[in-house]
Amino acid sequence: TSYTIYVPQLELNGTTITMNPKAVGEPVKLPITKRDGAEYVDVENATPLIGVTYTKDGDHVQLTAAPETMQVLQNKPVQGPLSWAFDPWPNQDAPYAKKLNVSGDNIISPSWFKLHSLGLESSPNINVDYVKAYKANGYHVWPLITNRFDPDFTSGILADEAVWKKYAQNLIQYAYIYGFDGYNFDFENVDYSDRDKLTRFVAYLADELHKYNIQSSVDVTGYSNSPNWSLVYDRKSFANSVDYVVLMAYDETWAKSTTAGPVASYPWVRDHAEKMLQEV
């Protein structure tokens, strides 16, 4: 079941966040948790953005109207070396119980968001229990956001800077309500003529998220002569905006290739990684 509310627009003054009830916010799915077959709203992270706060007294919980201000979260930045897992089919019932990396931090990126012409579209599978399970296992949770890999759609939203603010507000609200530490931008197949707009869009989102102590990353392909799939990325500028630039070290040989070959051979991955390190 999906329950959606409209969170007031967030405004920042120093380290204090003010909820402006006069400014209509963006729709946000409430964090639902299941216990013994029943559904409940998980308010642990959601307050005061959903309008309530709570106090515990033994076995009793008291709900009260939430204050209209709160402090910026103090999320800890990730520490390298990083191990990063991408989860295209997030399953709340079977989170990976082990750490991928014991000498640095671990990030999990569930595929939960898509850009929509009117704002952010969340997956019906978004789940607060998934977030809590991974965070309990020492992971940072950075959901993945796609542009649908549609160049025409992407051109439209890149030309409409008014919708950028909606995306930023929604991402911040979701991060505070669900407990996300950051986000991963997976914007692919973008028309080369929109290269500068894409660069500004990523920089805008990263800057707005940073104000609320939320980290960000952007995925880029390896190097090729493809305008929409490789040349469109201004990797150096991305590195000045986001916290991490993620190299998608594939496909050396595409699925539709007329000749057989490896997907990601070691020399190919090494060459692309070394070239990108010279830029970022």
Describe every region a protein language model picked out.
Residues A97-V102, I172, V232-S241:
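Mature extracellular/periplasmic domains of secretome proteins
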Residues E68-N170:
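Glycan-recognition patch characteristic of GH18 chitinases/ENGases
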Residues D87, W112, P143-N147, F187-N189, ...:
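A cross-domain feature marking catalytic cores of carbohydrate-active enzymes
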Residues T1-G104, Y178:
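Primary recognition of N-terminal secretory signal peptides and signal-anchoring hydrophobic helices
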Residues N106, D181, D243:
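Receiver (REC) domain switch/active-site residues of two-component response regulators
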Residues I108, F185, V245:
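Conserved, mostly hydrophobic/aromatic
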Residues N147-Y178, N228, V246-S257:
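Active-site-adjacent "subsite" loops/lids of carbohydrate-active enzymes
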Residues L118-E121, N125, R195-V280:
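Substrate-binding surface in catalytic domains of secreted glycosidases
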